[in-house]
């Protein structure tokens, strides 16, 4: 068989970037000897060449490769909530004494303040 090229695989996976990612993943699986019996038959070829040949021949399930790739990239299977309701109630209880203080997103109260730089000199904030 002649050298395999990316054009041979374009019929199966039209996007070259996707082809590279999936072929790399499959080559890594081959390199870790997931399919040891089949590698021995094609021993003279390296795993990337074997992966590209199998993708071009349609012997590899692209959907299964994609799912395997996604699963390998996941760090956690379930995302835990950042704040539980009990914790948020506890935080509210800690700041009950600040009920008179209004905290908003408006920073206009900073306009009247005088800021001092490192040398102890005043500078204006209107610049």
From Swiss-Prot:
Keyword Ribosomal protein: no
GO BP terms: DNA-templated transcription
Catalytic activity: RNA(n) + a ribonucleoside 5'-triphosphate = RNA(n+1) + diphosphate
Keyword Transferase: yes
Assigned EC number: 2.7.7.6
Pfam families: RNA_pol_Rpb6
Top-level EC class as recorded in UniProt: transferase
Entry keyword set: DNA-directed RNA polymerase, Nucleotidyltransferase, Transcription, Transferase
CC annotations in GO: DNA-directed RNA polymerase complex
A single MF term (Gene Ontology): DNA binding
Similarity annotation: Belongs to the RNA polymerase subunit omega family.
Assembly notes: The RNAP catalytic core consists of 2 alpha, 1 beta, 1 beta' and 1 omega subunit. When a sigma factor is associated with the core the holoenzyme is formed, which can initiate transcription.
Function: Promotes RNA polymerase assembly. Latches the N- and C-terminal regions of the beta' subunit thereby facilitating its interaction with the beta and alpha subunits.
Name of the featured protein: DNA-directed RNA polymerase subunit omega
Encoding gene per record: rpoZ
């Amino acid at each position: 068989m002649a050298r395999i090229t990316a054009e041979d695989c374009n019929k199966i996976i039209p996007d070259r970037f996707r082809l590279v990612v999936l072929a790399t993943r499959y080559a890594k699986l081959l390199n870790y000897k997931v399919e040891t019996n089949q590698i021995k038959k094609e021993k003279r070829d390296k795993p990337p060449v074997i992966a590209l040949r199998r993708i071009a021949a349609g012997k590899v399930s692209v959907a299964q490769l994609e799912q395997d790739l996604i699963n390998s990239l996941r760090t956690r299977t379930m995302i835990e909530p950042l704040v539980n309701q009990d914790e948020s109630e506890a935080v509210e209880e800690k700041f009950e004494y600040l009920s008179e203080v209004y905290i908003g997103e408006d920073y206009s109260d900073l306009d009247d303040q005088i800021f001092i730089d490192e040398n102890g000199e005043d500078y204006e904030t209107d610049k």
